[in-house]
């Protein structure tokens, strides 16, 4: 269905021949048995941890050149007793999809290793992610990400997303921390833990995962409780990322309401308010499917209580203010995304998912086809330097020289490789 036999867009348009990527892909992709991690990789240090395990930076041994990020899945645990009860659905999906997907704008899996009942996913190493880059541009004082860099990042992101969607894969967790960037300026979509196939599903996507996409990047149809959704949810997230690259802060920074003890999914009232503040109140005249949404009555209640009935879209006002505050103009060092940038943003942040622009349509938008040409290296022409990813030795697994079988926990559920700068709780 995908990967090995499918042609795809390259990062500057056109299609890659199948052979060109196979020759670049690390050999041995997929499951490897009776191999020890330390026999093949030198562990440089610890990157990050989270719910499901830990991530380490490593260098290949014995002619296996390059740097790698090794993601270690921990076994389930009760107290001090390790219970080998299996892997999470998220881990299984990520391994299955990453073993098949093969595109220059999707993170590359080198191999999977099973050692002492621990599973390791070995990925190519990426030095940066968009969250780290955004954070860098806010320190020590705010300075805009150059418009040509944003254009390249966005094009490569959409290019990878087109490949996923063409191969019936929804990512469902696009956000700056999950968009990786190599030191040579190549953008990779990472963390496929929430990704899933959407080709003729036996049940609604909602029945399998009731909550998807980090709250600030969650599409309105998801907030409205839609049981059926499409690749459009990923395009809304791209719009949020585009806005964040421009403004250096999340455009819809709401507070998430947590599930109750009965695991009932609550209406995300605060997040919907943040969207309405800028996008105006969604209306059935422009979004016919709105009235059939499970949370429509909640939206009506919100509109009445907050005086949102007459709230109109002010995205253009937000956009112009963003350009002014961050110094985007035709004669500035940062350049400008121009009117084309606003038009693309407005089509990505379209309330009605049936009208929202697709990845393929977005790649053909005048924002990319006019003005400064898109570069395959997003850092091209940029004279600044971004800090390297933070790698430490402060980890029991490293100090003990034993990666598998430890009692430590963690693995980033929000980033394949971790990140240098941690954001406030998302």
Curated annotation (Swiss-Prot):
Subcellular location: Nucleus
Entry EC no(s): 2.7.11.22, 2.7.11.23
Region (Disordered): 390-426
Segments forming domain Protein kinase: 41-368
Active-site residues, as the UniProt record annotates them: 173
GO CC annotation, single: nucleus
Broad EC category: transferase
Binding, ATP: 47-55, 71
PROSITE patterns reported for this sequence: PROTEIN_KINASE_DOM, PROTEIN_KINASE_ST
Keyword presence, Acetylation: no
Any GO molecular function: RNA polymerase II CTD heptapeptide repeat kinase activity
Main location per the UniProt record: nucleus
Classification via Pfam families: Pkinase (PF00069)
Keywords: Activator, ATP-binding, Kinase, Magnesium, Metal-binding, Nucleotide-binding, Nucleus, Repressor, Serine/threonine-protein kinase, Transcription, Transcription regulation, Transferase
The protein's assembly and partners: Component of the srb8-11 complex, a regulatory module of the Mediator complex.
Membership in a protein family: Belongs to the protein kinase superfamily. CMGC Ser/Thr protein kinase family. CDC2/CDKX subfamily.
Stated name of the protein: Serine/threonine-protein kinase ssn3
Native organism: Aspergillus fumigatus (strain ATCC MYA-4609 / CBS 101355 / FGSC A1100 / Af293)
